[in-house]
Amino acid sequence: MYAAAQAKPQSIEVEHLGPAPMSGPRLVATYKPGREIYAQGDLNDKCYQVSTGAVRIYRLLSDGRRQVVSFHLPGEMFGFEAGSNHSFFAEAITETTLAIFGRRNMQERSRELLALALTGMARAQQHLLVIGRQCAVERIAAFLVDLCERQGGGRQLRLPMSRQDIADYLGLTIETVSRVVTKLKERSLIALRDARTIDIMKPEALRSLCN
């Protein structure tokens, strides 16, 4: 299953993190890989900041397929949804530590939240453009460029998510993802250190594929 209904955080304690987009008291929770953070239909009364690890947000479609709508990396926040209940599932990809902010703190920090929400909205709009107009090579190139920028802009990229996650995010099959990665490698645009680590060999050439 993509989410276990009874999954709970492995440990929770009240403390303060280091630098964070929002100040004030928060809970800190650590989730094991694959653990559900919240489910579709759960009360929407918190927002979350990734301290370590990675999170996927997804929805299960009526035919049983999974559509991943976003990934969240250290320093990024998620959980912003309209309405009183969540419309998506959130799940830890790797062992993940989160700062969890309650509704009261969210209201007190509305200006900070607005900036974060707008950043998330811009990323979501860009993602819609990618999957709506680009071919498989362009989608994966855009995904790698975006992820690289979110990890600091260096030439080595660590993929916390699986190729199935990437396929479900980009609207592709896992076979297509593997073929495109191989094609980019053969063109010397990327090099694979292992299944989850990619060296960006020609960043400008990779970026040009996104246009």
UniProtKB/Swiss-Prot annotation:
DNA-binding residue intervals: 163-182
Gene Ontology CC, one term: cytosol
One Pfam family per UniProt: cNMP_binding
Lineage: superkingdom: Bacteria
Gene3D superfamilies, per database record: Jelly Rolls (2.60.120.10), Winged helix-like DNA-binding domain superfamily/Winged helix DNA-binding domain (1.10.10.10)
Keyword rRNA-binding included in the entry's annotation: no
GO biological process: nitrogen fixation
Domain HTH crp-type residue range list: 134-204
Keyword Zinc recorded: no
Keywords of this entry: Activator, DNA-binding, Nitrogen fixation, Plasmid, Repressor, Transcription, Transcription regulation
InterPro entries in the record: cNMP-bd_dom (IPR000595), cNMP-bd_dom_sf (IPR018490), Env_Response_Regulators (IPR050397), HTH_CRP (IPR012318), RmlC-like_jellyroll (IPR014710), Tscrpt_reg_HTH_Crp-type_CS (IPR018335), WH-like_DNA-bd_sf (IPR036388), WH_DNA-bd_sf (IPR036390)
Record-linked PANTHER family: CRP FAMILY TRANSCRIPTIONAL REGULATORY PROTEIN (PTHR24567), FUMARATE AND NITRATE REDUCTION REGULATORY PROTEIN (PTHR24567:SF75)
Function text: FixK is a protein that regulates nitrogen fixation genes both positively and negatively. FixK appears to repress its own expression and that of nifA. FixK may bind DNA at the FNR consensus binding site.
Protein name in the entry: Nitrogen fixation regulation protein FixK
Organism: Rhizobium meliloti (strain 1021) (Ensifer meliloti)
